[in-house]
């Protein structure tokens, strides 16, 4: 019984089958040849499996197509996040028609840039700002982070490339003694 409506097991089964067929079609659809920007991330969600709740890695790929429209290219589920799974995902995207990706924004998973490069060798990879900021918070004492984050923000909120480069140089110069921080940025 759902919302005071009784449904037979057969009806629920048929509805589930219909939805699953649409999901499979969507997940295997042909994609555009080029996505100038692609954002990737993996998050963990609780899912029901064998009558118990467990955490699974949910891989999400969001592309910005040549018309500037955002498009979810796919969603995959696995037990954990790994560079090898990301490699499989990029190979699947290639088989679905994606020939070129200019930039990928990603987290700092070890081996991820190499996994992307193995499928799309010309693609530029960059850690996303959110993950860089989280890493700054995780490696520095709280009393230092406010000023550092404020200085770092000047880089990625610059109005143009020239100003961003200048702010980056200022940041590196100011914090060059903090090797741990510089390595993360």
Language-model regions: role of each:
Residues 16, 76-77, 158, 165:
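Alpha-helical interaction segments
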Residues 117-185:
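Extended amphipathic alpha-helical interaction segments
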Residues 2-11, 17-106, 110, 114, ...:
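RNase H-like nuclease fold core
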């Amino acid at each position: 019984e759902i919302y005071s409506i009784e449904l037979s097991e057969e009806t629920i089964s048929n509805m589930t089958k219909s939805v699953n067929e649409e999901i499979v079609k969507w997940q295997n659809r042909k994609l555009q040849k080029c996505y100038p920007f692609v954002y990737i991330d993996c998050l963990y969600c609780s899912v029901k499996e064998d009558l118990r709740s467990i955490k699974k890695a949910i891989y999400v790929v969001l592309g910005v197509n040549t018309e500037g429209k955002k498009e979810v290219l796919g969603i995959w589920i696995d037990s954990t996040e790994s560079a090898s799974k990301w490699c499989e995902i990029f190979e699947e995207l290639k088989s679905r028609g994606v020939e070129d990706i200019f930039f990928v924004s990603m987290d700092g998973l070890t081996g991820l840039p190499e996994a992307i490069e193995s499928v799309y060798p010309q693609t530029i990879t960059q850690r996303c700002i959110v993950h860089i900021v989280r890493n700054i918070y995780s490696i520095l004492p709280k009393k230092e982070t406010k000023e550092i984050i404020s200085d770092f923000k000047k880089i990625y909120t610059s109005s143009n490339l020239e100003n961003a480069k200048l702010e980056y140089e200022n940041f590196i110069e100011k914090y060059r003694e903090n090797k741990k921080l510089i390595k993360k940025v």
